[in-house]
Amino acid sequence: MNSRTLKKHLKYIVPEMRLALIKEPGAKPVPIGCPDDLDKFVEPLKHYSEEHFVAFHLDAKNQVIGYHIVSHGTVSASLVHPREVFKAALLANSYAIIVAHNHPAGSLSPSPEDIETTETLIKAGKLLGVSVIDHLIVSSNGSCSLRETRPHLWPVS
């Protein structure tokens, strides 16, 4: 049975799924050299009254090629699942990601859940071949790079 025959057979059983990633015209990759380079991207997060979790997609040259809002939560939490974080990153053929979320109450200290999420994403990214470069926490008081403040979360390979 060839793939054409298989497709004909399967279309009577289940619908074929098609996923597409649509890039905005005119957007150009933006190089990232350090966490401060992301300030212009995360600035809007500082003003939200509910938690938002965002993933920035990078190419092999550490240039931001896209982003997606993974989740929008409550004033104190945002549900984040690795599947949702990496779905768009894989579709975008991302080499790496940087994730960021806001703390509406103003704290820049990572919660135990923030640490656990970071560890889970790093492990999932390693399995998928998409590196997690950093996890930023932002608030009206500034931003905090977990890569800089908690380097032990990133195992040396």
Question: Model features per residue range: what roles?
Answer:
Residues 12-69:
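Long amphipathic N-terminal alpha/beta scaffold segment
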Residues 1-18, 59-61, 71, 75-157:
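Active-site-proximal loop/helix of nucleotide/amide-processing enzymes and allied scaffolds
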